[in-house]
Amino acid sequence: MSKTTEIIRLTEQYGANNYHPLPVVLTKGEGVWVEDPEGNRYMDMLSAYSAVNQGHRHPKIIQALKEQADRITLTSRAFHNDQLGPWYEKVAKLTGKDMVLPMNTGAEAVETAFKAARRWAYDVKGVEKDKAEIIVCENNFHGRTMAAVSMSSSEEYKRGFGPMLPGIKIIPYGDVEALKKAITPNTAAFIFEPIQGEAGINIPPEGFLKEAYNVCKENNVLYIADEIQSGLGRSGKMFACDWENVVPDMYILGKALGGGVFPISCVAANRDILGVFNPGSHGSTFGGNPLACAVSIAALDVIIEEKLPERSLELGNYFIEKLREIQHPDIKEVRGRGLFIGVELHTSARPYCEKLKQEGLLCKETHDTVIRFAPPLVITKEELDWAIERVKKVFAGV
């Protein structure tokens, strides 16, 4: 029995069946390349759902991890630590916001935004107690916690987890008129993804982000952007909202914020919003821990110093152009921004992902019929050409 087979056997025997991974085991990674126990190399075209924008084991980020781990890793928020303040400042300046609240996972950050929006509605906007409403979009993916699941339009995500949280309205993605109709005096916030990742790399109609922003401003509704996947360079801009020069009231960040090395997430907003929290109203034992903050500072430095948003834009345009040259009856559409790309098929994407894996290219289906290509942003043009040849080969053979 191979090492790969044995590890998969153990995983399936003892692990809860809440994921459906491709049959590959990864033991090493560097840059855009990963390796299995038998020494086979693969190109990573998923980047851990955009958490590894800086590439696997970026030297600067790993060095920050090692140096901080040699000093102190966790203090809790009962005490100050020497990494949190500098990290706050870095994220505040990057987002242009007054305040930042740290958590660990993207779903926790979404939960934080949800709570902040509701409390803001009561304490600032003056909504009657327990009447606050949140507007979200169809086919969203904001995580797996109860608030996130309650916001989902997927019945499968909700099945068996009811009752759902009240006060949530779901509108079609990219529909400004539907947003206008959904708003009432009780509306606290509009929470959205500027590009829907899990839904299949869905890009809203041109002008939607700006128009929706204006509607929210006219109605005193918080405009909250979930940039967990689309942010930090993935879409070819620092934030996907930058495509329409929109600055949301609140950013929700995660994934690449930790450089693929240590989990860290946050929400960033001005004082009139995050000021609704007081000691004891929200928190996390690990949120803002010194190890995560040190890693995140280095992760953000890499994004800025290596101009990863600009790289993503240039190489993404090139990759999309090459993908669109592939002619095959199963291909319905190629779409994307930066290196955040979806190839929508007329059929299931899973068999294609399995065949690409056999050719040394790792990607994952999303929304059943979409192949998602989202490599680390440090990928080179030559490596993209290598990937294109594998994609062409797979489609030519099907």
Curated annotation (Swiss-Prot):
Keywords: Amino-acid biosynthesis, Aminotransferase, Cytoplasm, Proline biosynthesis, Pyridoxal phosphate, Transferase. Its cofactor is pyridoxal 5'-phosphate. NCBIfam families: Orn_aminotrans, PRK04073.1. One of its GO terms (molecular function) is identical protein binding. The modification N6-(pyridoxal phosphate)lysine is found at residue 255. One of its GO terms (biological process) is L-proline biosynthetic process. It is found in: Cytoplasm. InterPro entries: Aminotrans_3, Aminotrans_3_PPA_site, Class-III_PLP-dep_AT, Orn_aminotrans, Ornith_aminotrans_bact, PyrdxlP-dep_Trfase, PyrdxlP-dep_Trfase_major, PyrdxlP-dep_Trfase_small. Catalyzes the interconversion of ornithine to glutamate semialdehyde. Pathway: Amino-acid biosynthesis; L-proline biosynthesis; L-glutamate 5-semialdehyde from L-ornithine: step 1/1. Belongs to the class-III pyridoxal-phosphate-dependent aminotransferase family. OAT subfamily. Pfam families: Aminotran_3 (PF00202). CDD domains: OAT_like. It is an enzyme of class 2 (transferase). Its EC number is 2.6.1.13. It catalyses: a 2-oxocarboxylate + L-ornithine = L-glutamate 5-semialdehyde + an L-alpha-amino acid. One of its GO terms (cellular component) is cytoplasm. This is Ornithine aminotransferase.
